[in-house]
């Protein structure tokens, strides 16, 4: 069976790729540039991940409309990226309105064309308090949308292997599968060295701290988050 992987270049999409690779599927990879601050580094990591797993069927898509519509510190340089708030429940400034729905729509379109039966995405429910499109209920609903909005003979399923995992468990799973964490990027702000203080860096650093393993990427600072 063919499967499409949505690969941002981040830690979660890396481990999702490692899991999919274990299933011996025919893999195709999609990356979306939506005008995010770190798009060059993310694209570099996407390509490195694909090279590592020998994924040759790739699609790199421009989705600049998400930057044009605005509303997120990831795409609007005038909006500051929020610092780490690991206990907060408010939606952070890094939320890109309805982003994952757009990504999934593009992935479904491509899957129909190439005959893929699965779409893998590295969504994590742990983040759902800040990101409403990272919840299992969202993906359950989108599977129904696919069923209603594609040809009758189309059978495409969204797969979320990390959805119920904690970040530290994702690190452990990646280590178990020998995922190349050095090929991934999570920072919202920087493309040289990861900042270490944005929400995404904090979640990643805390996950590695909890496992007792040092994150292999370079940081400007490495605060303690546990």
UniProtKB/Swiss-Prot annotation:
Amino-acid positions noted as binding Zn(2+) in the UniProt annotation, renumbered to this chain: 187, 195, 198, 201
EC primary class: ligase
CDD domains recorded: QueC-like
GO MF assignments: ATP binding; ligase activity, forming carbon-nitrogen bonds; zinc ion binding
Pathway membership, UniProt: Purine metabolism; 7-cyano-7-deazaguanine biosynthesis
Cofactor comment: Binds 1 zinc ion per subunit.
Residues at which ATP binds: 7-17
UniProt EC number: 6.3.4.20
Protein family: Belongs to the QueC family.
Cofactor needs: Zn(2+)
Organism: Chlorobium limicola (strain DSM 245 / NBRC 103803 / 6330)
Function: Catalyzes the ATP-dependent conversion of 7-carboxy-7-deazaguanine (CDG) to 7-cyano-7-deazaguanine (preQ(0)).
Coiled-coil portions: none
GO BP terms: queuosine biosynthetic process
Protein name: 7-cyano-7-deazaguanine synthase
Keyword annotations from UniProtKB, A to Z: ATP-binding, Ligase, Metal-binding, Nucleotide-binding, Queuosine biosynthesis, Zinc
Superkingdom in the source lineage: Bacteria
PANTHER family (alphabetical): 7-CYANO-7-DEAZAGUANINE SYNTHASE
Catalytic activity from the UniProt record: 7-carboxy-7-deazaguanine + NH4(+) + ATP = 7-cyano-7-deazaguanine + ADP + phosphate + H2O + H(+)
